[in-house]
């Protein structure tokens, strides 16, 4: 996996947006470590076009207690100049297929949120998840501060049919 290309996609989200509440972009080596750690248990998918990495999505542990074993958290990042090309949708469709094959029943997305869009955050991620069939299930108010602004966090979930 091209950790360098994926870190280059992620870093601008950290440095210029409130989409992630991480405040310092990880090094390429740290990013590589995160990929390896995730892949021990969960899928990490990469979207490429003509050999160029355009985005990635992965599942992660929702909670560490065994009772949560049928749930996972989703994450997705698409290169900023590649939005609107269907990359996010394709990644999520594949991710959901892999989740179901793993026997997962719930996918949860933790999303930065603001009532009023600003230079650092819009509702694009919420709208994307709604289009993908996720529904809002929790809202935490003013729980994160970045770039001198308070931001909310919402959780959205996708529930697969119970087996």
Predicted regions and their residues:
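Conserved GNAT acetyl-CoA-binding A-motif
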Residues: 99-121
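C-terminal "cap" of GNAT-fold acetyltransferases
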Residues: 122, 142-163
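Conserved catalytic-core motifs of GNAT/GCN5-like acyltransferases
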Residues: 58-61, 110-112, 126, 130-149
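Acetyl-CoA-dependent GNAT
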Residues: 23-81, 92-93, 98, 102, ...
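A short beta-loop-alpha structural element at the N-terminal edge
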Residues: 1-6
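Glycine-rich phosphate-binding loop
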Residues: 86
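A short, internal acetyl-CoA/4′-phosphopantetheine-binding micro-motif in the GNAT/acyltransferase core
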Residues: 75-83, 111-116
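Helix-loop element at the rim of GNAT/NAT acetyltransferase active sites that forms part
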Residues: 8-25, 38
């Amino acid at each position: 996996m091209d950790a360098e290309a994926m870190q280059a996609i992620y870093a601008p989200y950290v440095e210029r947006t409130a989409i992630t509440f991480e405040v310092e972009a990880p090094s390429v080596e740290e990013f590589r470590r995160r990929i390896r750690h995730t892949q021990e248990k969960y899928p990490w998918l990469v979207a490429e076009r003509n050999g160029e990495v355009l985005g990635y999505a992965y599942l992660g542990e929702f909670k560490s207690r065994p009772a949560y074993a049928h749930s996972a958290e989703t994450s997705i990042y698409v290169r900023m100049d590649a939005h609107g090309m269907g990359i996010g949708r394709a990644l999520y469709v594949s991710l959901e297929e892999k989740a179901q094959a793993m026997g997962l029943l719930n996918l949860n997305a933790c999303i930065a949120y603001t009532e009023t869009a600003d230079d650092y955050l819009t509702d694009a991620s919420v709208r994307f998840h709604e289009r993908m069939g996720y529904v809002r299930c929790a809202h935490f108010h003013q729980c994160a501060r970045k770039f001198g602004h308070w931001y909310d966090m919402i959780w959205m979930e996708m529930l697969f049919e119970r087996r």
